[in-house]
């Protein structure tokens, strides 16, 4: 992908490396850009949820919207979506190891952090009890990411847009229903 961009820009293959310390720094910057764009899409969908009505319904609506934003982004920007998750050890899921055994740090405007805040909101408004909280972030992430990946590169890649929308709606229904 980088070489395609360099060719379109009319610069040499080594030009990008003049701006970064090494290959890992360059890949981290590209990954960060892709993750930020994905997070922006999720937040845009979440912000479109009406801010009136029962708190529980709003919180569930925001969670659903972030999931839909995630799936929509994957379908609209498959290259960026793959880039956000395609470089092992670089920006992987927004996680950065500070030291051996240190807790994982996640940047605040990362798709996973947005999901965490949505689930925290569900606990705060009483949709989910605190004792059911552990593991929900990863479970919801896996479901939405898995479906997005199946749409792009898996057995659902040949499904038409209508079918993908139907399947997305069903998955988001199952997630929302399972949390209540």
Where are the regions a protein language model picked out?
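Short, flexible helix-adjacent loops and helix caps
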Residues: 43-51, 86-89, 124-127, 152-156, ...
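Helix-turn-helix
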Residues: 1-25, 29
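Amphipathic alpha-helical packing segments from all-alpha helical-bundle domains
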Residues: 57, 93-127, 134-138, 166-177
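Short helix-coil transition/hinge motifs at the ends and kinks of transmembrane helices
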Residues: 48-59, 91-102, 158-160
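Amphipathic alpha-helical segments used for helix-helix packing
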Residues: 73-98, 149-157
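Amphipathic C-terminal alpha-helical segment
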Residues: 73, 117, 121, 141-159, ...
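Alpha-helical structural segments
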Residues: 8, 25-48, 61, 65-72, ...
